[in-house]
Amino acid sequence: MESFIASIRLVAATMLICVAGYSAAVWAVGQVLMPGSAQGSLIAAADGKVIGSSQVAQNFTEPRYFWPRPSAVDYNGAGAGGSNKSPTSTDIADRARETVARYGATAENPLPAELAAASGAGLDPHISERGALYQAARVAQARGLPQAGVEALIHEHAFAPGAFLAPDRLVNVLELNLALDRVETAG
């Protein structure tokens, strides 16, 4: 009986260390090293109301906003993941054709591939700088802003995430759209 009680104590201590201790340690490291990411990278409006996260794509459909990559999960964070459809699926081809048509792409002005294809998780908040520049004319016209000013804002918000590992510069769509709203409000 004594060894049974000792084993119960050992199981309880192990669970306490592995469950509570490990979780607390990971939480503490996250708070110290990456406090913004550990809190969800939330973005708040001027009134303090949370309007999104810089790590999760939102579905912008109005012409006055930059559009993110298509989402296989309809921008639902709870259902994050790619499509289970085969690359030869007619559904995927149909969705790509609809996206190309929505952008008004032509043979002379082809749509960057990323803007027609969903990311692996379906919630990628970034598009390439090239993808944003592709949309600049539409956004500028819809907002009544000079295209050069919209392009300058894109360049201002572009960043290189991994230096030589990911040479393409990226733009966070939500942050860029919020910056456009601020420019329009200030103008």
Curated annotation (Swiss-Prot):
One of its GO terms (cellular component) is plasma membrane. It comes from Parvibaculum lavamentivorans (strain DS-1 / DSM 13023 / NCIMB 13966). HAMAP family: KdpC (MF_00276). It is a single-pass membrane protein. This is Potassium-transporting ATPase KdpC subunit. The system is composed of three essential subunits: KdpA, KdpB and KdpC. Keywords: ATP-binding, Cell inner membrane, Cell membrane, Ion transport, Membrane, Nucleotide-binding, Potassium, Potassium transport, Transmembrane, Transmembrane helix, Transport. Part of the high-affinity ATP-driven potassium transport (or Kdp) system, which catalyzes the hydrolysis of ATP coupled with the electrogenic transport of potassium into the cytoplasm. This subunit acts as a catalytic chaperone that increases the ATP-binding affinity of the ATP-hydrolyzing subunit KdpB by the formation of a transient KdpB/KdpC/ATP ternary complex. Belongs to the KdpC family. The chain crosses the membrane at residues 10-30. Signal peptide: none annotated. It is found in: Cell inner membrane. Its main location: membrane. One of its GO terms (molecular function) is ATP binding. It comes from the Bacteria.
